[in-house]
Amino acid sequence: MTDTPTHRLLLVHAHPDDESIGQGATMAKYVAEGRGVTLVTCTAGEMGEVLVPELEHLAADKDDRLGEHRKGELADAMAALGVTDHRFLGGFGTYRDSGMAWHEDGHAIPADDIHDNAFWHADLTEAATHLVQVVREVRPQVLVTYDQFGGYGHPDHIQAHRVAMYGALLAGAPSYRRDLGEAWEIPKIYWACISESRMREGLRKLREAGDETTFEGMDPDGPLPPMFTKDEDVTTEVDASDYADQKIAALKAHATQITTDGPFFALSNNEGATAWGREQYRLVKGRLGPMGENGWESDLFAGIEDPG
């Protein structure tokens, strides 16, 4: 145990690519600083849309081999970020991507035809217990996952939120599954977020650049869907601008899911490290560390007196 990093971060995500989009720069920063970073991915993203024409045969309605391919993409993304500890919840293939449909109001909802092994249908206690084993092994001081809406409402994101929160609770219960190791209570839990002001700023730049298709229907001066967080509820912004290039490399590794030649990516590249390197969070358990001039905490590990 002498090689165990003093500070340890655990992230729970639904599909390969979610981690790189949301916290890629934060992950790379903490790895570079010698802090432990563990990623748990709940599914292999089998139901994802394939954006590479020559790989369309991998899709769920064709060869149904996308999950295996995305496993490789995720490994490449983790290599780009420097992360060496990645696990699939319960082991690869335990839970399958549930798929989704779009509601008329613009948020994601469960698809009509869901696979029997879909993560959305997973037994919550069983899935959370898989996470308990990871928590008690890694003993993280910080957990990052989605909010109760799962960000934009994808059923697997919502389920990942439930599993992460319940798993954290069970991991800290001394009488629960002693065979899985000594109880460990995670001191700080964050929900990943994007502030409304930051989203409005990005939307305005997209519209000024003539892009009306990215985030179609959203007006930078109009109401925003609940996937964005009111500024007063944001507690933390990690400035990992020095690691923006690693985040971009990780995004490019998820080639079947993320196109890097569209207007959104081009505009973000023009903004450089500011666009890719600042990642926001909302503390839901634990004590905030020191605040900066912007009124936000700048380090997820801030305020942890005894790393344990």
Give the label of every model feature segment.
Residues M1-V12, I109-G308:
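Metal-dependent de-N-acetylase/amidase catalytic core
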Residues M1-R139, E271, R282-K285, P290-E293:
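Active-site rim/loop-helix segments in enzyme catalytic domains that contact anionic ligands
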